[in-house]
Swiss-Prot record:
The gene is prfA. This is Peptide chain release factor 1. It is found in: Cytoplasm. Peptide chain release factor 1 directs the termination of translation in response to the peptide chain termination codons UAG and UAA. InterPro entries: PCRF, Pep_chain_release_fac_I, Pep_chain_release_fac_I_sf, Prokaryotic/Mito_RF, RF-1.
């Protein structure tokens, strides 16, 4: 099927759906038709704009035959030579298969990897940077778990981020983030290299993952603070083990055992859902060869070099000399570049 035929079908389908809704249909069919129309109507509008621009181009080319109209027609054609490719590119992007999770909230997990105390300190800074990014985007950032080290570093930080297109924006952040700098405890001025792992998981809905209570082992214990001191005399902390997969989630952020269990289940569902998504993605060779990487947590994706003031994303060879701005939450320039690279790779794979 040619692109033109695909566009014709979309316009025709939108017209059919509008007629169906106007005629009146029963509840379930009405909901399904409304949802489908909402999905394709923005593409239909782009198609109509493209066709209007194509008609304007044809009219301008015909007008060039008139010497009195040639200058005006040439100006119109110059404008349309920019407009037409842009509209066609936007339509091709809109026709790419969508990740069903893109519009979902996300679970952000950050942990220190190699580098001891320095890795934990950078993990805390990176967690704070993503929190500021959420603020800049107008998202809600709720801490589900935040465990500090004695020096104020981060042993484990988990947050739920809700808002528009959260997972779509953050999904390329999963992987190993490397930091190069002179630690505050370094007396010789030597640069140390440490690493932090970031995982971004789409939040799972009940229909995505079925969790059987019989598959869970739930332990309760007393919450502890940094250094292991007890901060709660009641057994409010919860550890849930999913026996079939061995996934373990511990939660002690809340004073209520019930709230800790609810948060732990939310994280467990997200991890199980991501496991399912990863297995499906492994079978899609084109996706796994995407230039922006696989989203694997073991993949080194970015380096933050403080002495040089630079941030380098290794997947797309992008270097920004504005590390201070990035650590203040200004990730958009990096994320935009990653998104464009991913779109280009998917367009190439689709032969578009």
């Amino acid at each position: 099927m040619t692109l033109e035929q695909k566009l014709d079908r979309i316009v025709l389908r939108a017209e059919e759906l509008r007629a169906m809704l106007a005629a009146g249909v029963d509840g379930e069919r009405f909901v399904a038709a409304s949802r489908e129309l909402a999905e394709i109507e923005p593409v239909e509008q782009q198609i109509l704009l493209l066709r209007a621009a194509e008609r304007a181009r044809d009219e301008a080319e015909a007008a060039r035959a008139d010497p009195e109209l040639r200058e005006l027609a040439d100006a119109e054609l110059d404008s349309l030579r920019e407009t037409l490719p842009r509209l066609e590119h936007e339509i091709r992007l809109a026709l790419l298969p969508r990740d069903a999770a893109d519009e979902r909230p996300a679970i952000l997990e950050i942990r220190p990897a190699a580098g001891g105390d320095e890795a934990a300190l950078f993990a805390a800074e990176l967690f704070a940077a993503y929190r500021r990014y959420a603020d800049l985007r107008g998202w809600r950032f709720e801490i589900l778990d935040y465990t500090e080290t004695e020096l104020g570093g981060l042993r484990e930080g988990i947050a739920e981020i809700t808002g528009r297109a959260v997972f779509a924006r953050l999904k390329f952040e999963s992987g190993v983030h490397r930091v190069q700098r002179v630690p505050a405890t370094e007396t010789q001025g030597r640069i140390h290299t440490s690493t932090v792992t970031v995982a971004v998981l789409p939040e799972a809905e009940d229909v995505d993952v079925e969790v059987n209570e019989a598959d869970l082992r739930i332990d309760v214990f007393r919450a502890s603070g940094a250094g292991g001191q007890h901060v709660n005399k009641t057994e409010s902390a919860v550890r849930i083990t999913h026996l079939p997969t061995g996934i373990v989630v511990a939660m002690q952020e809340e004073r209520s055992q019930h709230k800790n269990r609810a948060k732990a289940m939310k994280i467990l569902r997200a991890r199980l859902y991501e496991q399912t998504r990863a297995a499906a993605a492994a079978g899609r060779a084109a996706d796994r060869k995407s230039q922006v990487g696989t989203g694997d947590r073991s993949e080194r994706i970015r380096t933050y070099n403080f002495p040089q003031g630079r941030v380098t994303d290794h997947r797309i060879n992008l270097t920004l000399h504005k590390i201070d701005r990035v650590m203040l939450g200004e990730f958009d320039e990096i994320i935009d570049a990653l998104t464009e690279e991913d779109q280009a790779a998917r367009l190439a794979a689709a032969g578009a």
